[in-house]
Design a protein with these regions (language model features):
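Short hydrophobic/aromatic-enriched beta-strand-loop microsegments
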Residues: 58-61, 75-84, 106, 124-130, ...
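Non-catalytic helical/linker scaffolds that mediate oligomerization, partner binding
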Residues: 157, 170, 174-184, 188-195, ...
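N-terminal donor/sugar-recognition subdomains of glycan-related enzymes
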Residues: 1-36, 41-58, 67, 71, ...
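Acidic, Ser/Thr-rich peripheral helices and adjacent loops at domain boundaries
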Residues: 80-101, 129, 186-204, 262-271
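Short, acidic/turn-prone active-site loops that include or flank metal/cofactor-
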Residues: 63-66, 81-88, 109-111, 130-134, ...
Length: 273
């Protein structure tokens, strides 16, 4: 019911802003490589390289990564938000002035109304997108387009990058596990680095690079398994390579594990600006 209520509340903003179909028609195929920035504890060490190569890739960042990138002066092309909770909306409760220019915020249409309030308050460019939910399709808003967004904002960014015809998808900060010191997020994370450290029971899973095991929890494990299923389908049906350049956290089976430096030097050879 929360999703239905918030969708109805957000509907005027959806129909008065550009559609998802319009985004695809204007942006499809303009870049070969997408970097998906998640908010795992390994993100911090990748920020200097990301800043150096930012102009050579299309950057999709999670809502929670957005304030971190802003702090370090790294401008993403897209900021994605999937969840419908009020605490998630708070990632947009800030004002970064000129930094936001040319960033497109892609937000699921059932998002909390505070999300829209913060976006409008700072004149940010945004698009509300919908999944294939029955109650949404009943309204016949086909013109605005639909897409399956998965269970996490990283899935959403991955699908979006596929729809925009990227040939290489690079994940960073996609730990899906706790750091060695027990932190669940980077030091700059808005809700504290240990926000999820004691929230769930810890489970062991194979580590990045097959080097032993790391601690995770059941929600991250579900995200990991769904991502692995997606990568298997991508490998089977598309000419797209998926790289896990997190250099930490859990192993995501099927993703090509490479240092982020290797990916930057070998895949990012031209300036998109």
């Amino acid at each position: 019911l929360q999703g239905i209520e918030q969708f109805v509340y957000n509907l005027p903003s959806m129909i008065t802003h550009p559609s998802y179909k319009e985004l695809l028609s204007k942006r499809k195929g303009i870049s070969d490589t997408a970097i998906i920035v998640s908010t795992g504890p390994s993100l911090t060490k990748q920020l200097p390289l990301l800043k150096k190569y930012a102009s050579k890739a299309t950057i999709f960042c999670a809502d929670s990564s957005y304030p971190i990138l802003a702090k370090h002066g790294i401008k993403p092309d897209y900021v994605c938000m999937l969840e419908r909770t009020e605490i998630t909306a708070e990632f947009f409760n800030n004002d970064f002035w000129e930094f936001d220019k040319d960033i497109v915020f892609i937000v699921k249409s059932v998002t909390h109304p505070h999300t829209i309030k913060y976006l409008q308050k700072n004149n940010r460019a945004f698009i509300l997108v919908s999944t294939y939910a029955s109650f949404i399709q009943y309204l016949k808003l086909d013109y605005f387009g639909y897409f399956n967004m998965g269970f996490s904002v990283a899935h959403m960014a991955c699908y979006l990058s596929l729809h925009l015809n990227h040939k290489n998808i690079i994940f960073i900060g996609q730990d899906l596990a706790y750091a060695e010191n027990g932190n669940s997020h980077p030091d700059d994370y808005q809700n504290s680095a240990n926000y999820e450290s004691q929230m769930y029971e810890h489970i062991l899973t194979e580590a990045y690079g097959g080097k032993g095991e790391v601690k995770t929890h059941h929600v991250w494990l579900m995200f990991k398994q769904n991502l692995e299923q997606d990568i298997e389908k991508i490998q089977k049906y598309l000419d797209t390579k998926v790289y896990n350049c997190t250099e930490g956290g859990a192993r995501i089976k099927g993703a090509i594990e490479k240092p982020f430096l290797w990916a930057c030097e070998n895949l990012l050879d031209k300036d998109l600006n």
